[in-house]
Each structure stands twice: as C-alpha cells, then as structure tokens.
Amino acid sequence: MTADESALTRPLVYAHRGASADFAEHTRAAYLRALADGADGVECDVHLTRDQQVVLLHDSNLDRTSDGTGPVAERTVDQLRLLDFSSWKGVRIPEAYGPRSEQFLTLPDLLDMLRAAGRDIGLAIELKHPSPYQLKLEDRVLEVLRAEGWDAETSRLGNIRVTFMSFSPDSVRHLSLIHI
C-alpha cells in the first residue's frame, strides 16, 4: 500500500471511459464531463496505430464507435483524426467540450486534459490485447508517459496518479519484469 492509498478517507470514484453514459466513450467530451462531475480518476483503454501512436479506444475495430471500419492498428493517427467518434451516441456536444472533429484522443491528449484539471486525479490505463503489436503496446505507453515527465518510482505525472491494468497475463508480467 502506498502512502497516498493509506491516507484515503473515502472510496475513490473512477469514470469508466470518461462519462460514457453522457457522451461517446473515450472522447474529449466524456473525459471533460467526468472531470466536471468530480470523478477522482478516469479509466482509458489504449491501442497502437499503424504509426505506433497510443490512442484511446476500447475496441480493436472502428466499426462500433466511429464512422470508419476495420482495425485500429491498420490506420495512422492522422487517418483516425478524420473520423467521427462521437455521433454514434446521438448526443449534442456542448461547445465547451470542443467540436466533433476534436473528440478523438491520443494518450498525450488525455494527459494534457488531466494536467489542466488543477487537482489530484487518477488515471487507470488498460492495455488492450490481443494486439498485432504484442508487447510493443506496453513499451510505447511507457515511452509516452516518460516523455511527458512520468516518475516511475511514484507512478505520478504531476497531479496524475497512473495505474495499469490488462486482461493479458503477458502484459502484466512484462510490466512487472521491466520494473516500470
């Protein structure tokens, strides 16, 4: 148990894929609403694109949550940014949460939003498998976090507390063996 965890006086509440009951999951609007609602943390699912960018999507295919089709791994981040990831939910996005064209997020985009929250916030990153890039996903997530200033000893990036999760035993072992 960390010092942060032992000092808790109440349960922490995490918004799964952002405020996904209100807005399309993993979108700028969903995460901004979760922060506005007072979530103690947010959960995101990550995949790698063809150009090795870490993007926030639950499914490995684009069909359910965008106007695109096919595997996420076969697209570049620039190609994904051209797709509509919010209309499928059928909800109008308030102006303050940005236009539809800015709803798709990369991990660095989410980190910027969480830093701007101005308070301590948790981030639970789920590494999605199977991935055609196998454990390169874990390596790229760690590279992105380190480039942003993440401290592996405390698992903090400024005001952001970072945790990892995965259904993949290989992912869990890989993260444990490299001592993050």
Segments from the language model and where they lie:
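Phosphate-group recognition and catalysis centered on beta-loop-alpha active-site segments
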Residues: 1-178
